[in-house]
UniProtKB/Swiss-Prot annotation:
Pfam families reported for this sequence: Fer4_8 (PF13183), LUD_dom (PF02589), LutB_C (PF11870)
Species annotation: Bacillus mycoides (strain KBAB4)
Gene name of this polypeptide: lutB1
Amino acids binding [4Fe-4S] cluster 1: C310, C313, C316, C370
One GO MF term: 4 iron, 4 sulfur cluster binding
Ranges annotated as spanning the membrane: none
Binding positions for [4Fe-4S] cluster 2 per the UniProt entry: C320, C363, C366
Keyword Transferase on entry: no
Annotated GO biological process: lactate metabolic process
InterPro entries documented for this protein: 4Fe4S_Fe-S-bd, 4Fe4S_Fe_S_CS, FTHF_cligase-like_sf, Helical_ferredxn, LUD_dom, LutB, LutB/LldF, LutB_C
The name this protein goes by in its record: Lactate utilization protein B 1
Length: 476
């Protein structure tokens, strides 16, 4: 799949999202529900801000010493009998996994939920190597069955589907004969996948956090699929972004506490799976850890480094007013919402994603929601500044801003423009509102009321008001 979703331009994707009434209703319901659950879950911790500060401190320290902890992690995994591969690019990661698949002559691979494997198009690479890949996370399974529908949310990938849609997908694709009851459908999927876990040659997982001091990986989940994926196949491949690491189990405890409460409003998820070494009675015989860079090292040491503090909880997405209206697919990336608007241009470049930093009201709700205090709205502003500096913004926009700059720098020109505006805009007005804008203004007036400027400019009114007050004081 890769990081990119679709080929439509941003304005078309947003129009599609805004026009999808079911999706908008589903997002509103999910956001409202998750926000309430998170509030209740965080209240039980006491001072939530102290926990956030601790989470930020842990993530900052880890990133500032990332080379040290990655070295410690790799050394300990190899001591434990595992193999570590540092993949500079997505292509490097794909080729390494393909070689394992070919070497093992693997025909069936089970896979638990992983955003980084989506980012590097790992499923397609495995299929090229001649093996079948089965997504075993329920939401990811639904999307895969539905002709590889892309995810719309980091934690709830099929947020844009309801139970009736899912039931219809199962009936069409899997000959399901049951009802749309979620429990019944979940049982059907469990039964459908059960034999595949036992028949799988290789298991592939993501990694919420790797623990450097012990060479362990941890997976946080609410379904048993991740645990089955890590224990039943003889070979396990875990793929992680290079930043998904903690120094010790003590720090892991803090971050898991923040993650569970921030993502789905739980004190703890149903399963927290830890794997330290292969060869145990309930684990794989062979373990490979693929540590993916894919542009992350270019972010380290820059003004955007704090985005790598992200623990993929989606708390920012769950409060974002823009995501609420346009949905996840409108971002054109597997990473939607505020975190996606910051991260995606850094990994994918401005040529493809220069619109995303503008998909924000800059309200700051995302920053307040983030459990590790990433200053997301500040980073979006930094993106916008860089886009302008690199002349990535549209020509029409640059011309308009140059004209505006000249107008506000010249008192005479500014005064003329302010006095002329009511008359220039009169043909577009109905009453005291502008009904239809011209060019870029059209998108604004189609959805919002735009008042006609007053005939008396504010500066003129203010000068007159001050003079009248001064005269009144002098007479008294």
């Amino acid at each position: 799949m890769g990081m990119k979703i679709g080929n439509d331009p941003f304005h078309k994707r947003t129009a599609t999202g805004i026009g999808d009434q079911f999706m908008r209703q589903a997002v509103r319901k999910a956001q409202d529900g998750l926000r309430v659950k998170k509030l209740k879950a965080t209240e039980s911790l006491g001072n939530w801000e102290e926990w956030r500060a601790l989470g930020e401190e842990i993530r900052k320290h880890t990133l500032e010493n990332l080379d040290y902890y990655l070295y410690e992690l790799s050394e300990n995994i190899e001591k434990n009998g595992g193999f570590v591969y540092f993949a500079k690019t997505a292509e490097d990661a794909r080729e390494y996994v393909k070689e394992i698949v070919k070497k093992k002559n693997a025909k069936k691979i089970v896979k638990s939920k992983s955003m980084v494997t989506e980012e590097i198009s790992l499923n397609e690479a495995i299929e090229e190597a001649g093996a079948e890949v089965l997504e075993t996370d329920l939401a990811e399974f639904i999307l895969q069955v539905n002709d590889h529908d892309p995810p719309s949310h980091i934690v709830v990938p099929c947020l844009h589907k309801d139970k009736e849609h899912i039931c219809e997908i199962f009936k069409t694709k899997l000959n399901y004969t049951g009802t749309s009851d979620p429990t019944e459908m979940a049982r059907f999927v469990r039964s459908y996948l059960r034999d595949d876990f036992f028949a799988a040659d290789i298991g592939v997982t993501g990694c919420n956090f790797a623990v450097a001091e012990s060479g362990s990986i941890s997976i946080v989940a609410n379904e048993g699929n991740a645990r089955l994926t890590t224990t039943l196949p003889k070979t396990l491949i875990t793929v992680m972004g290079m930043e998904r690491i903690v120094p010790t189990w003590e720090e892991l405890d803090v971050l898991v506490t923040l993650l569970c409460r921030s993502s789905v409003g739980q004190k703890l998820t149903s399963y927290i799976t830890g794997l330290t070494e292969p060869g145990g009675t309930d684990g794989p015989e062979e373990f490979h850890l693929v540590i993916v860079d894919n542009g992350r090292s270019d972010i380290v040491g820059t003004e955007f480094q704090s985005v790598l503090q992200c623990i993929r909880c989606a708390a920012c997405i769950n409060v974002c007013p823009v995501y609420r209206h346009i949905g996840g697919h409108a971002y054109g990336s597997i990473y939607p919402g505020p975190i996606g608007a910051v991260l995606t241009p850094l990994l994918g470049g401005y040529d493809e994603y220069k619109d995303l930093p503008y998909a924000s009201s800059l309200c700051g709700a995302c920053t307040e929601a983030c459990p590790v205090k990433i200053p997301l709205h500040d980073l979006l502003i930094k993106h916008r500044s860089r886009i302008v500096e690199e002349k990535q913004s549209p020509v029409a926009w640059n011309v308009a801003m140059k004209g505006f700059e000249k107008a506000v720098k010249s008192p005479r020109l500014f005064s003329f423009a302010a006095k002329s505006a009511p008359y220039a805009l009169k043909p577009l007005a109905k009453g005291d509102k502008i009904e239809r804008g011209i060019g870029p203004l059209k998108a604004w007036t189609d959805a919002r009321d735009f008042p006609v400027p007053k005939k008396q400019p504010f500066r003129e009114w203010f000068e007159k008001h001050v003079k009248e007050n001064d005269d009144g004081h002098s007479k008294s």
